[in-house]
Amino acid sequence: EKATVKGKQTDLSFELKRHEGKWMLPLRPILLGGDDLTFVCDGRIALDLAETALAVFEGSDVPHLGKITACAGVAITRVHAPFTRAYELAGKLCDNAKALVKQKDISSCALDWHIGLSRPGEAVTSIRERQYQVNPYTLTCRPYRLSSENDDELSWRWLSKTLLDDPEVGLRGKKWSTRRNKVKAFAELVREGPGGVKAALEAWNVTAKEWNVAKELCLPEPIAENGFHEKHTPLLDALELLDLHLVLESDGQGQGGNEKP
């Protein structure tokens, strides 16, 4: 079956196949031992495959242990980037996700990612301070917990399914996808803080009313008002993944129906 993105065909240069009823995932395992799993894959599906792997742990019920959790670090680099540095970065990102779970004292899987290589020896916290800190605001919400049964807001699944792909409020949804220049504008607006984002949203919608455009531009809760939750914003995280994060789904034409691998 073809790889699809939310029902649309996309050229990933490979097809998803099934063997004896099981999906053959397009990845190459590098390390399978102990409690660690490392694999290499097309960067555009890396986060989706990481979520799929974490979901297995999320749904686990081990005798005498109960529910177990796991964390993932995803380093998205160029094809010819030094593997050792990418591997080390992925490990640091995984540790950062683990720190979130420990700090928040939550029973949830979590993941973190970075696009490109870091400086040699640079900690993830230093990367975030250098690239995403505009005092008093933090322009990222990474790492993300996968989600929880009672609270999906500001989780990875919220970012992927709502902030990116919700038809009404998602940045890749029906309303925002035809206003790509405005979506890209968030990259600079967030540096002005909540006030800058709020003012832009209001101005865009006033203009839309003047042109008799019925579709009001809005963001999902809990960032609907100004793009921020407290002093953090997930908008830059979403913008970085706008053209890079693909969700694999069945096209429904072959064996497996609408199953997701």
Language-model regions: role of each:
Residues 1-261:
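Charged, helix-rich terminal subdomains or tails
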